[in-house]
Structures are given as structure tokens and as C-alpha cells.
């Protein structure tokens, strides 16, 4: 048994984690933010980093320090809630949305520019068959994920992206563009909300388990040494993400004069790469996107396989991986636009719950791990995050929306769940003072 993880292994696992986080959405959103924020890009990307890097890092640390998985953290409210929440979480960042999205995004950017005269449905089917075939093969043996992803795919991807961003930095396409309306008032806060789109706070409490298992596979099992190694790997991934996000946001912010106000992140990347490198730029970008999507897909399929085979012992890891991969292949062939449209309402509803679970895991010693605090806080948060999900689905809340906009702080900014969550936690704690706490968390977990 090792008492510490060698620096080399720490770096490899850190880059593996970076690769798992740095999926399709992570590459698309910063340039989109940059072009929209213009002169306010630095304030906006600062807010983006809080939710796109800070929250995921907290999720990794929470898993490392508590020694629990996603269900273990959610069980602190109640085991039934823990199971339901974790199943929804894995389905959302797994075969329903995130995994199919990796295939469709890599197709849109890595394949479409080079396809002419081929029917879209046929080309998408062929591409996703190959993409998920590779995913399936590499996910079948998770013990090799660290070496394959950390040693091979990540350096290739990082080098490609580095070439693009360095070219944009040293030979900028123009000055910082004009600020769009969305980023004029509160650019930091707008960037903060945009960071939700990465889904990385959700993924962090899943990927955290992958990191813990990777460290254990290197012979480090003592709890403190294990936690320290996981935190170091998390910091390495966070630093890598920060550099890439800031660079891509700058690329977007300086792109308007050269390529026009494109708006969509994928198109900004494609047009900017072509502007900077010519036809070679599309090849470079396509390779980077495909590798990024592939590494994320492998990590998500692996995590889903481990979780559901544990939840349902009758299903082996291989069977679950097969089901998840095939289902993802089917969903991917509905196309990127449909996947995103279906995912936003569900993510809007569950993302705040994940944030609350992560934050409470750091401070639960203060309120003596009382379940009532977890339950009341999650109820307060969930009621209003569900409203966000309903609005995101396109349904009108009518007079209720008007009332909440006028009376609930932060509601108009999309995080009206914050105050109800805090009030719920306080109410839960006060209740325990009058009626006594229920069983301690360590008795029910």
C-alpha cells in the first residue's frame, strides 16, 4: 500500500479528469460567451469559471473527502431520495442526453464540413455507429481508461486546442467586440449562469468516483492519502479547464470583426479555425472536437456501467455498457437540436439540487448532519428549480411568474431557488431544536 501517489501518476489522473470534463459543451460555450460579452469578456468568463470550474472542483473534493459516491451524498437527505436522484442524474448525463450529445456534436463539427452529397440521416448513422463502437470497446475495460485517456487521447486533444488558442492570442483576429444586450447589465452573473450549461457540477459527483478508483488502482488506499491525491488531480484538471476556457472566450471576443456576429459556439469555432488556418483549420478543429467528445463518452459510459450494475446486480457491467451504448446511439440519431431541446428543462430542474447537495456536504458538521436540514433545503430548492424547468420547457407560468419576478430575489436572474433553499435549511434546523433530530446521517447511510 502506497502512502502517497507519485507525481507522474497524479498528473496522468489529473489529465484524465480534465479529459472527462472537457467534453463538447465545454468547448462550444466559452467562444459563444466571448463573442456575446465583447469588452466585458473578462467579467463574464470570471462568472463562468465559478460554475464551470469551481463547482465541479467542489464536487470532486466532496467525493474525495466523504468517501461517498453520488448516491451516498444524496442519501444524506433520505435513501429513497438518494436512489431516485442518482438514477435521474446518471440518466441525464448518460444515455438520455450527454452521451448522445457527444456523438452528435462530434458529427456536426468533425464530419459535416467534409461531407458532400451524402444524405444527413445516413451519414449521421454511419458516423455514430463508428463513434459509439469505439466508445463501447474502450469502456469495456475501465481499468485501462486511465492509461488510454490520460496518456494518449488527452495530450493529443490538448495540443490541438493549444495550437488554436495560441494562434488566436498571438495573431488575434481583431479587437474585443461590442457588448451584446445580455452582457451589459451583469456580465459576471450572466457568465455564472452560462457555466451551468457545461453540466460539470452534475458530472463531478460521477467522475469523482472514477478518480477515486483510479487512485486506488495505483495502490493508494489510506483515506487521507486517497483524498489528497484526488484533490490534487482535481486541481490539475481545474487549472487546465481554466486556461482553455479563458483562451476560447478570448478567441470568441476577438472574432466578430473577422467572421461576423455568428452567435453559436460551434460555428464560431469552425469559422475562426478556418480564418486562422485556412482549410487546415477545419481538419484541426474536427479532430479536437472528436477526441474531446470521445473521451467524455468513454467516461460517461464507464460511470453508468459501474453504477447501474451495482444498483441492479442481475445486470453485469458488460450488459449495462451494451444497453447504455446502444440507447445512446439511438438517441444520437434524433440529432443535436432535439437532444438539446429535450435536455434543458430536466437539467434546469435537477442542477440546483446537485449544487445544494455538494455545498451541504462541506458544512453538514455545522448542523450536526441533521436530515431535516437536508430535506427542507432540498424541498425549498426543488420547488423553484422545477419552476425553472417548466419555464425552460416553454410553458408560461402566467401571473405566478410576474409575482415571483417582483417579489423573489434572484428569480429574474434564473436562480430564484437560492433564497428558498436557504430558508428551508434554516427551518429544518429550527424544527430539530423543537422536536429533536431524526436519526443521524451515519446511522442511516
From Swiss-Prot:
InterPro entries: Brnchd-chn_aa_trnsp_Livcs. It comes from the Bacteria. One of its GO terms (biological process) is valine transport. One of its GO terms (molecular function) is L-leucine transmembrane transporter activity. Induction: Expression is under both negative and positive control by the transcriptional regulator CodY. The negative control is direct and the positive control is indirect and mediated by another transcriptional regulator, ScoC (or Hpr), which, in turn, is repressed by CodY. Thus, CodY and ScoC form a feed-forward regulatory loop in which CodY acts an indirect positive regulator of braB. This feed-forward regulatory loop at the braB promoter is an arrangement in which two regulatory proteins repress the same target gene and one of the regulators represses expression of the other. It is found in: Cell membrane. GO terms for cellular component: plasma membrane. Keywords: Amino-acid transport, Cell membrane, Membrane, Transmembrane, Transmembrane helix, Transport. The keyword Secreted does not apply. It is a multi-pass membrane protein. Coiled coil: none annotated. The chain crosses the membrane at residues 11-31, 45-65, 79-99, 122-142, 158-178, 192-212, 233-253, 275-295, 311-331, 339-359, 375-395, 415-435. Branched-chain amino acid transport system which is involved in the uptake of isoleucine, valine and probably leucine. Together with BcaP and BrnQ, plays an important role in the activation of CodY, a branched-chain amino acid-responsive transcriptional regulator that controls the expression of several dozen transcription units in B.subtilis. NCBIfam families: livcs. Belongs to the branched chain amino acid transporter family. This is Branched-chain amino acid permease BraB. It comes from Bacillus subtilis (strain 168).
